[in-house]
Amino acid sequence: MDVLELLRASANGCYNTIFSDAWSQYVSQQITSSLYLYIALGILTVLFVAWFIYFKRLARLRLRDEIARSLNAVTSASGGDLRGLRFRKRDKMLFYGRRMLRKMKNVSGQMYSSGKGYKRRAVMRFARRILQLRRENMPLEMRTVEPPAEYLEETIEGSDRVPPDALYMLQSIRIFGHFEKPVFLKLCKHTQVLELMAGDYLFKITDADDSVYIVQSGMINVYISNADGSTLSLKTVRKGESVTSLLSFIDVLSGNPSYYKTVTAKAMEKSVVIRLPMQAFEEVFRENPDVMIRVIQVIMIRLQRVLFTALRNYLGLNAELVQNHMRNKSITISGHLNSQSQSSQSMRQQTTATATGGTSATALGGQQLPAAVPSLPLQRQPPPPTIAPPLRHSREEHTLSGPNPNPNSGNNVQLPEVHGDAPNIDIYHQQQHGGSTSTGNLSTRRGSLVQPSIGGGGGGSTAQEGGCAAAGAPTIDMRLIQSSAVESLRKELGLPNEDAHIIEPFVEVRELEPNVTLITEGNADDVCIWFVMTGTLAVYQGVADATRSSTATTKSDKSDLLIHFVHPGEIVGGLAMLTGEASAYTIRSRNNSRVAYIRRAAIYQIMRQRPRIVLDLGNGVVRRLSPLVRQCDYALDWIFLESGRAVYRQDESSDSTYIVLSGRMRSVITNPGGKKEIVGEYGKGDLVGIVEMITETSRTTTVMAVRDSELAKLPEGLFNAIKLRYPIVVTKLISFLSHRFLGSMQTRGSTGAPGAPVEANPVTHKYSTVALVPITDEVPLTPFTYELYHSLCAIGPVLRLTSEVVRKQLGQNIFEAANEYRLTSWLAQQEDRNIITLYQCDNSLSPWTHRCMRQADVILIVGLGDRSHLVGKFEREIDRLAMRTQKELVLLYPETTNAKPANTLSWLNARPWVTKHHHVLCVKRIFTRKSQYRINDLYSRVLLSEPNMHSDFSRLARWLTGNSIGLVLGGGGARGAAHIGMLKAIQEAGIPIDMVGGVSIGALMGALWCSERNITTVTQKARQWSKKMTKWFLQLLDLTYPITSMFSGREFNKTIHDTFGDVSIEDLWIPYFTLTTDITASCHRIHTNGSLWRYVRSSMSLSGYMPPLCDPKDGHLLLDGGYVNNLPGHLWRYCRASMSIAGVFPPFCDYRDGHLLLDGCYTNNVPADVMHNLGAAHIIAIDVGSQDDTDLTNYGDDLSGWWLLYKKWNPFTSPVKVPDLPDIQSRLAYVSCVRQLEEVKNSDYCEYIRPPIDKYKTLAFGSFDEIRDVGYVFGKNYFESMAKAGRLGRFNQWFNKEPPKRGNHASLNEYTFIDLAQIVCKLPETYAVNTAEIFSEDEDCDGYISEPSTLNTDRRIQVPRAGNSLSLSEAEMDSDVEIDFRSDSKKDKATQSTPPAPGKDNEDKTDAVDRIPLLTLERPLTDQQQQHSDETDEQETPRAMKDGTNTMTTQTTSPTTDAGSEWAGSESELEKENKNVNTKN
């Protein structure tokens, strides 16, 4: 920094008199010739030293002369003889004693004072003794504790209790769902062990595709054969992996087994493979139909999630996944003859009526159909119709092996057009003025379908697709249309003729005009089975993008992509019907069409009577898929990982990539020294390991599951095959990787710097599931959850779940191990439909609390900030249960008290597992003690109001969803007063501030805002501090000898300390950081904790003016952070460190490590990149630094200083612009800062703002009000222009301006998980009589037995292998010995905490109940009850809870009670249960 500029600014800012101008001019002239000043100082120093030496020598000579005179006097007095003189004995003893003691003291000092650091301590003691320094009391330091080993290491557990072959089979068949032990043992009986040599075929083309193959040892290569005879590898199957196809599984179960057409598997080395025939499942399904239905549903769900997610969202394949049209399909539409109402002749006339514009059946087929024919088959092509059963749908040539007619096809696939002359299968039509009477079964039910009904009295006016109906066309009886639709749907559902009466009451017919939307993508209310009778339906899908939010529900029609057409005789809607999820497509009518449909509730009622129709529906979905999907089905794998399990490890070969379907993954790198660091975290929808796979390099990190997670594995072979077939995939991936690398380049600046916190790593701060845990029973957890839920509703759909809500939706016994699949599936669907799900834990270690820990991406530990910080037993158990899950501390403060956060370090030091903390100011209603019912009633009204976007709850909500808004304040001396005006303008613009970072003067202003959050108070304190900086006499008293800096920094420290006091960064309301330049380690440092005033002072230590601040942590010297990054404990210390201007103020010594800190402007004067790394999604960066003059004079190859002096002093010559020595040094110091600033300006996450304050100098603190007004006016105009241009929405685009409507804050009843097995097989809800006993048993167990990956077999039943089967022998399969499938650790834990075994009577009763078949557990319904159940299913009327949240209608026969009474009843029952548990314990 130029000294001349500073002194001029000081003079101009404080004095306007003639004397001050003359004084400043005189000083300027003197400093200009600084070389002469230094020479003069040197001469004076030499003269002073010479005089000092001369004086000391003169004094020594005088002393010697005096001694000589004294000796001469003694000699003369004794006559010149000194032999008679001697010392006295006591003088001798005293002399020798002192001498001995002096030697002993030196020896002891060497013994006890030597060692490491002795010299340094001795020098410090000597300096204190000389300079009389006082060691001030150091503040409380934050204890730095390394995370536990489990946080960064994977879980490596053996499976000694399970034979390897049985374990591999368990892991392979779990893709079909969860199987109980008896079912698994029955499947084991059908296994076969195959031994293959290298080169042997496991299966090849034309072999039956009817088995599941599990590799026990060795390696199998799965490849496809092309038409030219070449092969292309899909994947390599290694030990423990399997080869299976979900689509082939459905084919086998439906009685239509297929064969391998293009896929072949060959052993690459000697291998042992376990073969499980798919026919083995049929035996199990016959005995347990609910298992069959559940397996079909699981297959459909995973088909939709794994295949469609991988191929559609990431590879850009849409229309290629389904067949564009069905060829060689013969459709039969039956028209039942009604002899009671019409004669045979009239029926024959009606059957020959035209379906399109008067075309007769004779014209279509070339012959007259006999009247005795009960069905009229028609084909799409003009050849004559034949009476034949429906043929299977042929597949469109979308394969990996066939030639691609359009290699650039991707999203723009040309589908065959179906024009008006397309044949229709419904040969009946209505006359425009017909008068047929419809039956009672044809009553039109109006849902969300907005299309005209079939006229009054059964007739209607409908335009057919071939043209307008002729006026004289015959009239069709609606009963014949209805019977035709019933017969067609009966055959599509695979029902025999005698079961037509089952579906007849539920079949509805609609006449559609062109462009009528039947159902939209993402809609779950209007899911139906649609059968096209005439016309054509078009199926669309939104343009998929890997970065697109799953919660987006509104999009224009232009973004929809045409997938395929549904022609007459085809059915659509089976996938959504079987999965129970929302529709994945948008279906519209392409022209005038007639469709028959059955609603979802009706289909489920039909399934109850005929469960086998799920196979026909599933087979219909499979037939529609292209061969490409089947080939991908062999290669794509579904993987379930428990918490701690590794996806892949560092230095392993990379042969696949993974897609996170649910859960959370953590990437950890192991450095050469063995230390492990977090590289990043991945959430739902992220792509893991894609870079290593494409570049064919080994894995650079280890990726493990933070919680239970589901992944889709995409092998490299499949990726290459799709790449060759569809080049559009390359474009899709290039776009995806470009965005990823661009983001990593923009955030690379401060990553990995010394002193950077863990949050500086590129960890995604966007969570899908959040668990809320109270520290004590005094914490108002329910009101806190409601307030957070209220703020989250402004961002997107959110769900709040408690144990009471889950039991109310899914039954009281939902937390039992038998209901594991139903609970996990329901929770997974809720997480998919909402951007975030809140899991409110119980106040004890209940099964629900265990479930919350397993489901959570992050755990919020909620406590009261004004209470004790001690850790409770319950909180320690939470850390033990979820060691890898990130935990954040939330401290609540009542709004009525004006107290600020304090003692936060004590909270954090007591909880080393906490990675972040939040201070939340709560309104009065949160701490009001009320009953659960009154709390629910209160927040049912609060949730209808608009949330306060500036509250701490909204700030916490934005942090959890990855929408935080950061404010970065740059350095610039007195020009930083513009920050105050900009803060006021930001507040008036309605932009919330969630995080603040600053450098130099920006560190001071940002710390004031985080501490006060009131613009008036911040302005007053900033003005007072600026006024102190204008007192020149205090600055003169602070002058010192300019070895390190011009000022000692004592008075400057006092001004910052008086502003903040002894406040720590952890005690600020808003997350804050400051940046300094560490001259000890030659890097920048980010301070997010510690002494506030010290690090602000360090960030303001400009070189040459203030000495660097010595970091008390490690002793490093810190300078102004602007030298490396001009935009980014006790608070004042780090503020002081951030203001340590080199040369003016001395570097500030960090009290933690002793590093010297200087102003952060030397490294980064606008640290917006640091803010982005800390989790801010949108950033406002305000730059008030000085700008260097780039218009310099070209003086040639050499430069004479005398010529510059002549140009400067000669008023008659033109001035030249050449930098002097201080200016050159300043430009060199700011080189990295300028580069960092340009990157910030070009980033897409930052809004760079620079107020017009260039005319103000760095030390013009006297112009505080003027500079502040300039910043305010500029900021107000800037944000108004942004609002007019529509760019202000990037800072509040997530915020819902409209208040939420009633019932919108919970969506449990709008859409919920549908368990087909429970619906079809009528499995009743079993409510326990004594719920306290259930709670006591559940609380003792450690979680669930959720997945087979942790299942271990008891050693008691392990016997040697018998025959070509699994290691489980026949005796084991038939024995009644209970197999414990838990892991070793969990079993030992459960063994220690298992309660005593129940009595003999209870055990016998339990066994008796288990032996009853599932289908006989339900009491038969009476006719009246059945009618009431049917009406309930058809209407699907939701019930609203009293607290404003919706609940799901359960499949029970109990009458519906009042919502308020339900809440009150559940609360009283919960209190009784807790009392019983406490009593029993």
From Swiss-Prot:
Residues 339-379, 401-412, 1445-1457 have a biased composition (Low complexity). A motif (GXSXG) lies at residues 998-1002. A nucleoside 3',5'-cyclic phosphate 1 binds at residues 175-302. It is found in: Endoplasmic reticulum membrane. One of its GO terms (biological process) is glial cell apoptotic process. CDD domains: CAP_ED, Pat_PNPLA6_PNPLA7. Residues 336-420, 1366-1481 are annotated as: Disordered. A nucleoside 3',5'-cyclic phosphate 2 binds at residues 492-624. The chain crosses the membrane at residues 35-55. Pfam families: cNMP_binding, NTE_Ploop, Patatin. Residues 1379-1390, 1400-1410 have a biased composition (Basic and acidic residues). Residues 56-1481 are cytoplasmic. Belongs to the NTE family. Interacts with Pka-C3; interaction inhibits the catalytic function of Pka-C3 and the esterase activity of sws. This is Neuropathy target esterase sws.
